[in-house]
Each structure stands twice: as C-alpha cells, then as structure tokens.
C-alpha cells in the first residue's frame, strides 16, 4: 500500500499559514493590503493586546460580492490574477489568494461586507471552516475581525515575543503603508489609544511629520528623478538625523514596501561621506516602474524582489541624493538633549509618568516667547508628543510614531503612554504647519533652514576681499565667522551674528586633504619621481597571486610594481604628488588594501587611499594653532565641495544659535 497521500485541507492551510502568518503584524499587513487593493480611502486598524487577542480592519473599499464569499477563504482564490501573463503585470499588493485562507486556519475570523446597492453579508470562519453565513447590516466596504490568533497552534503562540515588540512590529507595518499611500486616511488604534492617524491629503511629508515629528519633517529634502524605465520620488533627511540601524530606510516599488541590499547601498553611497560609519539615514523613496521589470513573486511575504536594470536604478538613486545635498548648508545644530548611550536608562512606567507630570507642570508654569513659526511648531509637538517617554537615544523600532514614542521592540517590558484625543484645534494647527511646510517642499527648499540660508547667503564673503564683497559661488556654504580661540588644541571657536561655531580642526583639514588627494589619484599622469634606491617589498606566494592579478589596477592609481624575482617586488618611481616623506608607507598601505579586499574596485581603491592619506597628513588633536592658522584653515574649508563632514562622516562644524546659548544660561525659558 502506498505511503504518499494528499493532506487534508485544514492541515495544508496550517502549513501554508506558517509562511504567510508569522506573527500578528503579518495579519495586519495582509488585511491592510487587501483594503488598499479594494480601493479604500479610509482604513481603520484596531488591535487588542498587540493583535494576539484581536485585530479588526475596517475599510470603505469596494466590498465583496455575495456570490464570492464562499471562495474568499479558499486557498489560491483571487480576483487579481487570471492568466499566466498576469504575473508579469502585477500592480496590486496582493495576488496569491493565500492570506484569508491562512489567517482563518489559525484564528477565528468574522467578516462583514457590503457592495454598492446590495445587502450586507456576514460570514464566520473557524479552523478554516465556514460555520455561519447570514445577511447582516453593513456599510459599504469590508469589516474583518480576527480573534484568538494561533489558538490552535500553541507552539506558535508560545514563541510570540513581548506585547510591546509585537505592537512595535504592527506600528512599523502601518506606518510604512501610510507613507506609501498618503491619499488614504489610515488610523491605528491599540487598546483604545490612537497610535497613528493620517489625514489622507496625499502629501507624503505630512505623513512623515506624523510619524517622525516636525523636527525631522522640517529637515527632509525632496528628491525626484527619471530614466527611460524608472521614476523615483521621495524625501531624504539631513545627515544630522541619522540613526544607528537601517530600519529607517523605506523603499517602495509601485507602492509596495520592499527590502533590497543594492538599493540600500545606493542610498548610503548617495550620502557618501555625509554619514559616519555605522550610521544610517531616514529616507523614503518610491520607485515607479513597469511591473514587467520587477518580479515580486520570489518571497513568501513579498518583501524581497528581483529587479531588471538594477544598475541603472542604482545610479539614479545615488545621483539624486547627491544632488539634493550638493548646495545645502549642513551645519548641525547642537542637540542640548543628547545623553551618551552608556547613560541611557529605560525607566519604569511609574517613573516615566512622574517625570512627565513634573515636566508638564514646569512647562505650564513657565512663560515662553517664540517666533510665530516656533510657536506653531511647538504647539504641534506639544499636542503630538504630550506623553512622550524620554529615551534619549535610538530605540530598536524605527517606526514608533511621535504619539507612541514609548514602544520598545526589545523583550523588555516598559509602559507606554496615554495619548490625549486629538481635538479640532490640534488638527487646525497641524494643517497650517504642514501646509506651510509642503509649500516649502514644492519649491524644493529645506523648511528648517530656509530663513537661515537666506540670511546667511547675504553674508558669504570672499576671503580675498576683507571689505566683504558678496560671493555668488554656490560652493561657498560656510558663512563668514570671526575666530575667537581654540579649546584643548582640538576645537576652533568662532562666532558671527547667528551664534557660536565649534570646528574640529582635524576633521576640517582631513576634508581638505581628502578632496586634494581624491582629485590627484583620479588624475593619474606620467609625471613621476624616480627613486635613487628602489623600494623593495616582500610578499608570500598567496599574496603574489593576488598582486599579479591586480597589477594593472595599481598602475591606474600611479603605482608601477615590478616583480624582482622570488618573493620580492620593487617600485622605482612614484607619482610626483605623493608626500615625499611617506611614499613607502602610502604604497604599502595601498597594496595592503588590495590584499585585504581580494578584489579591486578602482573607484573604491582611490577613495580608500585618499581617506587614508588625508587622515595621516592632517592636524592631530592637542595641536595648538595660531589665530592666522585657524583662519587659513577655515578659508580652505570654505572652498571644499562638501565642507560639513570629514571623509568618515563625522561633523566638522557644530552651530550653537544665540537662542540656544541663552537657553543654556536660563536667559530665556
């Protein structure tokens, strides 16, 4: 008798659910995608106990026809595909017809739906079987309630992480969906508390303001670009808002959130030396393309995709991000609230509550005076962050909204705040601020520094003109400043009417020398300096194999390496621009780069060598400078293409505004 037999439908569905429904957030994702595909303009997501107890998604979409209800919970039953060719033209978020079948096999599901000019229907499914189907009162659209998730798969339920982790995952999904569909009003409610509420205005920057807060939203830079195959649109945050992980990078293809290593790499290359090693930007990029250029059917959750002409898209993203920051003033403001990571404390719920109440009482008793723009911004933030729990460093979950800042996605329990209901005044203030911000984005100007840039642009001086003739050179983004002195032989102190500046002298000279060496390495010429005594290098046999393979690439950066017999190689000349006292060390370091990488990317090699040389040749800390030397250094920095960060991404200049200084000394409150 044969041993192979076809599995029962209920068992097959449970197995399939293991791929589709990993956790509560998977259910939210699938139901939210269905609502969007149904053409909904309003979607409400309500969860209890982070979705473990219940998940309810209500939309005003097209609804489900009565005759289709019998098929809705069948595997591979869908209205989105019909023929094989349809797989190459997918524009909907869902298409496999697996979601409802998988969900209903591991949860108890109640679905109410109604289409135009039709009576409503209700259907109840448990363990994959329809137990009840009856007429019911229902508004146009679909109302689906998922209860007791994983009730019949206790092993899966056992490995659910903390409720705060699960709620963080749900918030992540909903926020990303809200960003990619700003024309849909989306609300997320957890245990009766509003976590997110978007207005459906169609403006992505408004959604990002709701998620990240106005401070980040005002420092977003709009990007847009086209090729014959791709159109990209999005916002990238200024480098000062970088984070410690990649979770703040949101990439969408035709409205679908995806993860792609090469596109992440393109974004980081676009920022290039503006980011410190180990830091990642906040950004949102939506890519519109013909569906035939992307295969979305390669991953159970459809997060990973395969792209055609990936290199073309890569270069488009890099170029548009670089253009976005090319002529901008990127001097970071001092963060007065910064606390070192080692001092980070996750307070208990009661401690947080007491701290907040004390802070609130103090703020209520203080008399504050701001400009009209600052007043509007702080009004918005006061309403939007009224019960914020203070954790002064990045927490794991990137998409904790400003109305739910307390969510921690580690397995640590931490209370989360109660949010006040948003009243009409709040929405009015929010709308005014965001409309003003949107107008600024439309003009492709950065809202947070527009006034500063306008003022500062009138105060750029030509270093050769002491009388202060204005310079129109767009490269000159460092404002004129008066040197005051030096701290610890490391930081230059300067001032102007905008406040005080601190300049890291090592980072400043490192940037200057980096651009010099980068240009020189990129212009390899026949101008060489002969050595009276050739430099000799000794390599093992395996190292020789690598070096022989990449000798031509070394020649492209000016190193003529010749085999001298046995394990020895010689260099008898070197490019004239090499610092004479470091020729041997530079050549040795360049060869070591090749031996370490076991491959050569000429662009990267030139980059690495330029960074290495600039770092070694720059002023070190505890090196005291004369005032004229400091002034000369600032003048040279003013001529740099990217004068705000060193090649490693560390800031060169930090600005303390006059207001911030007065606040430090309690001159203003």
Curated annotation (Swiss-Prot):
**Biased composition annotated in UniProt, kind: Polar residues:** 361-379
Residues annotated as transmembrane: none
One Pfam family of this chain:
DNA_mis_repair
Q: Which InterPro entries match?
A: DNA_mismatch_repair_CS, DNA_mismatch_repair_MutL, DNA_mismatch_S5_2-like, HATPase_C_sf, MutL/Mlh/PMS, MutL/Mlh/Pms-like, MutL_C, MutL_C_dimsub
SUPFAM superfamilies found in the cross-reference section = ATPase domain of HSP90 chaperone/DNA topoisomerase II/histidine kinase (SSF55874), DNA mismatch repair protein MutL (SSF118116), Ribosomal protein S5 domain 2-like (SSF54211)
Signal sequence region: none
Q: Which PROSITE patterns match?
A: DNA_MISMATCH_REPAIR_1
Region called Disordered, residue ranges? 357-379
Q: Which UniProt keywords apply?
A: DNA damage, DNA repair
**Would I find DNA damage among this entry's keywords?**
yes
Gene3D superfamilies xref list: 3.30.230.10, Histidine kinase-like ATPase, C-terminal domain, MutL, C-terminal domain, dimerisation subdomain, MutL, C-terminal domain, regulatory subdomain
Q: Name one GO molecular function term.
A: mismatched DNA binding
| A single BP term in Gene Ontology | mismatch repair
One cellular component term (GO) for this entry is: mismatch repair complex
Q: What does this protein do?
A: This protein is involved in the repair of mismatches in DNA. It is required for dam-dependent methyl-directed DNA mismatch repair. May act as a 'molecular matchmaker', a protein that promotes the formation of a stable complex between two or more DNA-binding proteins in an ATP-dependent manner without itself being part of a final effector complex.
Q: Name the NCBIfam families for this protein.
A: mutl (TIGR00585), PRK00095.1-3 (NF000950)
Q: What is the protein name stated in its UniProt record?
A: DNA mismatch repair protein MutL
Q: Which organism is it from?
A: Staphylococcus aureus (strain JH1)
Per UniProt, what is the name of the gene that codes for the protein in this document? mutL
